[in-house]
Amino acid sequence: MKFLSFKYNDKTSYGVKVKREDAVWDLTQVFADFAEGDFHPKTLLAGLQQNHTLDFQEQVRKAVVAAEDSGKAEDYKISFNDIEFLPPVTPPNNVIAFGRNYKDHANELNHEVEKLYVFTKAASSLTGDNATIPNHKDITDQLDYEGELGIVIGKSGEKIPKALALDYVYGYTIINDITDRKAQSEQDQAFLSKSLTGGCPMGPYIVTKDELPLPENVNIVTKVNNEIRQDGNTGEMILKIDELIEEISKYVALHPGDIIATGTPAGVGAGMQPPKFLQPGDEVKVTIDNIGTLTTYIAK
């Protein structure tokens, strides 16, 4: 399944992509009319949080089938053209990010590969697919992109052993880790440079792990104005998905809806000669095989 959160007619909702259509089943409405018992999560985060007692996907499947068979299926579908995509997990939980997890990317920025580099991104930085974000020209002329695979956590745990780590994964999404390279180079921490308003585009969907079991050999391509800038593969990650979860959970308790950004391949603007930073009016597309394409526009 492909889950998403969205705004329609000024109301926030969530849903699951309609198969073979650019449309979403509005699960707020579907559950209101076809839920079994009192199962009626109001947000995707609430659904994930209840997944430990009920099979969330099975509840979704049953409710959608009932809507399809009702004779009024179209009443529960909304075209992608009519919605505003929100970050898939809404309201947002923690976003924990790994830097320097691709050797070639670390090398292009002259960073040490051996040292673990972890940071968080502010919840206020999150935005969805097709968003226009500020150009931040008032504070920087070094706005950069980083296309990344995101892991969506599906159940709570800490000190999770590598052998069990994948049991805690609910699915995967796409992240563009927008970065102010000027602030990053001037400061001893990454939080501010990584938490600009609009600095964490995410989506368009969460693809559940039954559809994408282990994306450790999928292509990540980032284009700026249709020019390929990053052309990498998750097989290049230094720490794999199970190792990332094991490492983070040694220190931080993970909960449903938490997102782990797994690092970016080579090809960022700061690594080019001369550097090629984002400019007002730019279009940035991050595509990951079997998930989709995340599009972001830089305000003029």
From Swiss-Prot:
Its Gene Ontology molecular function terms? acetylpyruvate hydrolase activity; metal ion binding
Q: Which residues form a coiled coil?
A: none
Q: What keywords are assigned to this protein?
A: Metal-binding
Q: What is this protein called?
A: Uncharacterized protein SAOUHSC_00906
Q: Which InterPro entries does the record match to this protein?
A: Fumarylacetoacetase-like_C, Fumarylacetoacetase_C_sf
Gene3D superfamilies xref list: Fumarylacetoacetase-like, C-terminal domain (3.90.850.10)
Name the family the entry cites: Belongs to the FAH family.
Origin organism is: Staphylococcus aureus (strain NCTC 8325 / PS 47)
Pfam families (UniProt xref): FAA_hydrolase
Q: Where does a divalent metal cation bind?
A: E146, E148, D177
